[in-house]
Amino acid sequence: MNHPKPPQQQPRQDLAEIIATHLSSAWLRPVAEHSRAAFESVHRAVDASTAPLIIDSCCGIGDSTRNLASAFPDALVLGIDKSEHRLARHRSDDDANYLILRADVNDFWRLAAEAGWQPAQHFLLYPNPYPKASQFRKRWYGSPAFSALIDLGGLLTMRTNWSVYAEEFVLALNAAGYQSSGRQLFDEKPITAFETKYKERGDSLFEVVSDLDQVALAQT
């Protein structure tokens, strides 16, 4: 009888080595044409805007995008998710200061960085944690996409309900040369559907924040 493998219990010992490999190696995966088309569909609007840009990556049904747009009324908020099914459930507000886009952020981050986008803030809220140790390279900081995430810059905010993910995210940022702060969330108003669900069932919630425009750690 096969028993399910338990979640990873602590940060990987070789995390810094993996990060160094990603940051020093070119990602050879070609950008998909549908991703390029999705990027071009919003490129002009973003370039024409004088408002600070906030990116809400993997936004799900877009609740977080709408809430961020309400919290930052002077910004242009761009919510991105690859799932047509999830985005179809979004309750749009035609007068809001945000855009919703279906795209794969693996490609979108690279295209945005290559185009010179400079988001003021970037939110990555409750990404799939892939908790098994064998799934490490599927986590954002364990994948080649982490380099593009870093290249975009801006004030990065990541939230998760898994403490190991938060710990590893801090370690990954440190390995890349960036300072970060981590904290447990207690009284914050939920801004995503997942955050509401996790809070209602009593999960511990964690936040990691890093200013990717400030390289503050000496590289060895």
Question: What kind of feature is each model-predicted range?
Answer:
Residues 1-53, 63-67, 92-116:
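S-adenosyl-L-methionine
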Residues 57, 80:
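Conserved beta-strand/loop positions that form the S-adenosyl-L-methionine
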Residues 58-62:
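Class I SAM-dependent methyltransferase "Motif I" SAM/SAH-binding loop
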Residues 83:
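Conserved SAM/SAH-binding beta-strand->alpha-helix loop
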Residues 152-160:
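Conserved beta-strand signature within the Rossmann-like core of class I S-adenosyl-L-methionine
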Residues 165-172, 176-220:
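Class I S-adenosyl-L-methionine
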